[in-house]
Amino acid sequence: MAEHMVARSIVIDAPAKRIFDLIASPGKHPLLDGSGTVLKAVSGPERLELGSEFGMDMRMMGLPYRMTNRVVEFEENRVIAWKHVGSHRWRYELEELDGEGTRVTQTFDYTWGHTFFYMMSGAPARNARSIEGSLRLLKREAERD
């Protein structure tokens, strides 16, 4: 089902813990969003864990909306993924490299349903660009001194 996933990776000159702490903090998500759709965290914990639910104020094509997400995968400093009503998942995987930083892979996984809709709406290509932007922003934030 890899054809229903979009993934991009980047190497960040920071330990996995620092990077993971950013990703696991919904309040930081607007700083890390390459799509320009994430506005602010409105509900949920300050730091995510398996099963956490968190709400985000969003805006797409000028229209505001609220999205509730639930963490469905969690391995401290290694993997975190969440899904929402659309059933697709956003997943981050972190791999510390020997003295070379941390490889971060972000995946938009739409194998869980509505694949035809996602493909027809252009979501895979649009989300690939957004992931690339998000990873650049994550790198910038994580590498700050």
PLM feature segments, named:
Residues 19-23, 29, 54-56, 71, ...:
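Hydrophobic pocket/interface hotspot
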Residues 36-39, 140-145:
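Short, highly charged C-terminal tails/helix-capping segments
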